[in-house]
């Protein structure tokens, strides 16, 4: 199923939310108060309280972009068809071409183009590939001062400190325990890199139109 078809009316069905168009939102009818960012995020988190990770966000509106996700440890994150997540040093690996779907300001889901699986993180801080878009597949995208990004779970954090679980890759390319990873560590620092369609034409055959 196409990601933007699968990502549909969950946010649209939440009361008071405007309609997202590109990177902007249409204003609600005159007289209605536009939603605040905290309310939009809060609605996503409330949707997960019925059982973290089990709530399927099958109708989430979003804007899609394709990138590679390069970690400061020297690896591109990839999602394999068997549901495992690991790093690869190969540039433009098929399993390392990812679709970033913006579901709210600062919130994204990440889907492997070739595997068709969404990046997820469970309550133990373990990364995995999910066939369905659930609340465990929503991450907070934070732009850091060193020009890298961090991605943290939208629902899992330490109860005592409030520190969130972070997506991270070890120095050998294996996924790092998100519960033990911290924002300032290079394991958690990622750089979204552009994708050259000519390097992976098989992933763009339905999008590209060739003219002779």
From Swiss-Prot:
GO MF term set: fibroblast growth factor receptor binding; growth factor activity; receptor-receptor interaction
Gene Ontology terms describing biological process: cell differentiation; fibroblast growth factor receptor signaling pathway; inner ear auditory receptor cell differentiation; negative regulation of neuron apoptotic process; neurogenesis; positive regulation of cell population proliferation; positive regulation of ERK1 and ERK2 cascade; positive regulation of MAPK cascade
Keywords carried by this UniProt record: Growth factor, Secreted
Localization per Swiss-Prot or TrEMBL: Secreted
One Pfam family, short name: FGF
UniProt GO cellular component terms: cytoplasm; extracellular space
Coiled-coil residues: none
Gene3D superfamilies membership: 2.80.10.50
InterPro entries: Fibroblast_GF_fam, IL1/FGF
Subunit text: Homodimer. Interacts with FGFR2 and FGFR4. Affinity between fibroblast growth factors (FGFs) and their receptors is increased by heparan sulfate glycosaminoglycans that function as coreceptors.
Family the UniProt entry places it in: Belongs to the heparin-binding growth factors family.
Descriptive protein name: Fibroblast growth factor 20
Organism expressing this protein natively: Rattus norvegicus
Gene: Fgf20
């Amino acid at each position: 199923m196409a990601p933007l078809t699968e990502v549909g009316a969950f946010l649209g069905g939440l009361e008071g939310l405007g309609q997202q168009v590109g990177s902007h939102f249409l204003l609600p009818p005159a007289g209605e108060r536009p939603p605040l960012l905290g309310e939009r995020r809060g609605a996503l988190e409330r949707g997960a309280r019925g059982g973290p990770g089990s709530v399927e966000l099958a109708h989430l509106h979003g804007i899609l972009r394709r990138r590679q996700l390069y970690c400061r440890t020297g690896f591109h994150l990839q999602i394999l068809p068997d549901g495992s997540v690991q790093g690869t040093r190969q540039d433009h690996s098929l399993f390392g071409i990812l679709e970033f779907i913006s579901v709210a300001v600062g919130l994204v889901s990440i889907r492997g183009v070739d595997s068709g699986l969404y990046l997820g993180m469970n309550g133990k801080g373990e990364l995995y590939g999910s066939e369905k878009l659930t609340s465990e597949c929503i991450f907070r995208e934070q732009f850091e001062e060193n020009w890298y990004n961090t991605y943290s779970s939208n629902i899992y954090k330490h109860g005592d400190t409030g520190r969130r679980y972070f997506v991270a890759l070890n120095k050998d390319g294996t996924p790092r325990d998100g519960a033990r990873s911290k924002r300032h560590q290079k394991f958690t620092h990622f750089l979204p890199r552009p994708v050259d369609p000519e390097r992976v034409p098989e992933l763009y055959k339905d999008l590209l139109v060739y003219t002779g």
